[in-house]
Every structure is written in structure tokens, then in C-alpha cells.
Amino acid sequence: SGRGVFVARSEVRFRDILDGLSNTIMGGEISTDLGDRDVRNRMNENVGTTEIQNNPIACRDDIDPERPRNWLSTVNLRSLDSEGRGFRWANGNGNFTSINTILPPNSELCVRFGPTGFGVLPPSSQHQGGCHVLMADGAVVFVTDSIEAGDSTNGTVIRGGTGNRAPGSKSPFGLWGALGTKASKETIEEQLNQ
């Protein structure tokens, strides 16, 4: 729904970030795909369009309970090396370079229509317990995996949505979701860079 700083085919200026430059995430780390079925960098696209919009954790059942950082070996994952997370740094398609603040850092990648599609694209890193994000004011902040992220089973904000899913509404994904919106009147009191 174009709630973040970077929106395809749109021009956004600092003056458009009404939630405040220090309250808005501009970018974040992404862990590069190593070919090891890691949920943070190997996209799972075994999900339907409405599934992922209505339930951002729709891919969670495909996570290996014995190795919770990996997809089950029975899950069919795209294996083209050229389509790995972070492999095409200048490509604007979500899987390659984008993040969103739906699920907390280091959560699973769940997409529809492969690397050129849309989905849940949390930032990720090899750091223990979190990742770095770039705030719109230029500050770099380490955000923990345990950041308050609201109800991860709540549907996402979408064009034509109603209630807490309507464009312009506050994020249903708690503090984490609020940090990802630029103009939803979601200012925060917490100090992030301490």
C-alpha cells in the first residue's frame, strides 16, 4: 500500500515523512542467500495472494521444527542462484533489495510470485538477536528480534482494506510496524538508539 519511504514509481521527499525522520525506518540489513534453506534469506513462495495478505505468517508451518532457522526439506523452494536474496543489489524487486516491517527482524521470507512478486520481507542479518536499520534521519539502530510487533496473524494494510487494514490506518504490527510507516501519524516515545 506504499506506506514506507521507498515506493515503486513514486517520489518521496523528507517533507513527506510526517511520522518524523527519527521515527521512520528507511532501510535495513538483509542476509544474503547462502543456499542453506535459511528462512531469513531463502524465499518461500508456496502461498496464495489472499493467504499472505490475510495472514503474514502463512509460511510458518513450512519451518523445520528441528532447525527453526530453516525451511523443511520437503518444501519446494526456488533454486536459481541468480534469484537469491541480495544477489541483485541494483534490482528494485522486493526479494533482492527490499524490506518491510510486517514481521520482526530475522523472521521468515514469505512471498507470492517469486522474486518479482510481493510479500513479507523482514530485514535480516547474521548478528545474534537482531539487525541494523537505517532511520530516515541517518541514524543506524540495532533492532532486536523481540521488538514489539503486534499481531502477526492480522492481515496487512491493503488498498481497498477496511478497519485496521485501510490505507492511512495505524500499523497492526505494533511498534515495529509503526517504524515502517512514513505518514500514518505513528510517532513513538521510545528512544531507539541507546
Segments and roles (model prediction):
Residues 1-194:
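Hydrophobic alpha-helical interface faces used for helix-helix packing
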